């Protein structure tokens, strides 16, 4: 049996940590590449591998949600968006995507709640909120009492 010195063991551990850290980044970048090339099954596999090494990577969950949106699997899309928001509560793209799902489901209360949250955090996609609220006002039942 080989005895390792503490120094050798420490180097071995650091190398493995280094490989895991940069390996997961490699999985994400490869997934992004596949996503841009519209190779969604391969992209999904890479994002899932990235999550194994980095379970708190909200962007991988967001891209999985985008893939499930394309595949029209709303249940998995919504699950990944919720996970994205658990990790990164101010992710405006995830909030916006959830608003669109809630609008499709005619869940007006959820759309309004998400819209309020969205207006507090939006930086890039602020105009999208206005469009959704306009759609909501066109669909929402009028009170004719």
Please state what every model-predicted region is.
Residues 57, 91, 125-126:
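Residue-level recognition of tetratricopeptide repeat
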Residues 53, 87, 120-124:
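Structural marker of alpha-solenoid helical repeat scaffolds
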Residues 49-50, 83-84, 117-118:
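Canonical positions in the second alpha-helix
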Residues 36-37, 70-71, 104, 135-142:
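Register position in tetratricopeptide repeats
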Residues 112-145:
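Terminal, low-structured helical/coil segments at or just beyond the last alpha-helical repeat
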Residues 63, 97, 131-135:
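Canonical tetratricopeptide repeat
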